[in-house]
Amino acid sequence: MKRRITYGLLVALLAVNLGIGAGIFYFRSAQAAEKDSAYPSLQLFSTVLEMVRKDYVDGKKLTYKDLVYGAMKGMINTLDPHSEFMEPEKYDELQKDTQGAFGGLGIMIELKDNYVTVLAPMEDTPGYKAGILAGDRIIKIDGNSAEKMGLQDAVEKLRGEPGTDVTITVLRPSTGQAQDYKLTRAIIKVDMAKDINNKKEFPLGDDKIGYVRLVQFGEKTSDELETALRKLKGQGMQGFILDLRANPGGLLDQAVDVCSKFLPRGTPIVSTEGQNSAQNSRHVANGHDELGGMPMIILVNFNSASASEIVAGCLQDLKRAQIMGERTFGKGSVQSILPLEDGSALRLTTAKYYTPSHKVIHGAGITPDHLVPMSDDEEFALALKERRPNFDTLSATEQEEMKNVHDVQLDRARDLIRGLLIYAHRVPENEKIAGKTQKVAANTQ
């Protein structure tokens, strides 16, 4: 509330500077406690604004809008990496983004230690096919330094008309080497659910353990998972592995729908809490456990974020699934888009996600029940192995190395489910034997 009113007062003060005295009425009628604390700072802002206009060498080239826009960008940039002030042009681009009317490289990015960092490449996209990996740092875009570049500025420079080219310089922390990639932008269409072979066939092995990897949480994620589960159950699945590694997240409603496939209707899934009570919400399961309680493992790593963490945190809290891998990214905040009257907008962090036991996700991440770390070299090799279309481009030595790459986290998950299944089968048998023993004992008395 305070930040929103402060913005209103800022606009009112600017109106006074422009000779529109009516704005001061709103300022003086604002809540008294807010006014008393904000007014001295706004006076200072007004003084600096006029000093820049009067004394800066190129001050005459700057409009009040230029200066206020710059001030608002600076103000929002002090909050967190996910909040941002968007000028009208950028807000228009964001709207195109949500409507899917844009070309891109298919890489999800975050700001990490002031570097534009790849959170995850989306499969079957230009970035993925070129070999961009999670954790790569984008240090240049078309030859221009990306150091200390804002997240939205980077997004704006990376996307564009489908068919156009962009060159990015990527530093790979695991090797310390930088490499240029010339990529052609494309309309991004991604399959959300994939099988062990990066396809959509979902075969079931002799161990009867099903496997589905969710690439991200888009509009069709829940439907595609439903199709996969139907295929696996039709083959006699007895245990299930849900792979959320390197899944950067996506839509909240899809995370809720995914959780709903493994929980009874009405079970709490996630809640949001913010400074404003309007941002508080509670989401519950809207389906039923389609697997009937069969053993379930969720694989996660540091690049599992947002909606992935909601699913993992929920099913861990409710003891419906065991989590295996590495601690997740810790991106558990809600961004609201707040349009402003001149066509600009704020992207503002307004709430945080909480698991059913009220554990905060943001900054903390989800800690696995079974910690199975992988080295940078192992993750790098596994990521290359998953890019089967690029396998032939590797040297003979690299191809031989790829054949020996094992997914230790997936192997451990399979071992754990096998153990759970053996135990589940033995318990009824032991109970049956115990019952017979008691009956014999009774007959001999």
Residue ranges and their predicted role:
Residues 48, 71, 107, 168, ...:
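Residue-level signature of catalytic and energy-coupling elements of molecular machines
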Residues 22, 31-41, 51-65, 117-121, ...:
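Cleft-lining beta-strand/loop regions that shape enzyme active-site pockets
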Residues 53-119, 165-167, 171-199, 411-436, ...:
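Extended, small/polar residue-biased N-terminal targeting/export presequences
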Residues 9-23:
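Hydrophobic membrane-insertion alpha-helices, especially the h-region
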Residues 39-42, 46, 65, 69, ...:
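Electropositive phosphate-/nucleotide-binding environments in soluble metabolic enzymes
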Residues 27-33, 47-56, 392-397:
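Acidic/histidine-rich, surface-exposed loop or edge segments in extracytoplasmic proteins
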Residues 2-9:
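Bacterial N-terminal signal peptides that target proteins for export
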Residues 345, 352-445:
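Conserved functional hotspot residues or short segments at active or partner-binding sites
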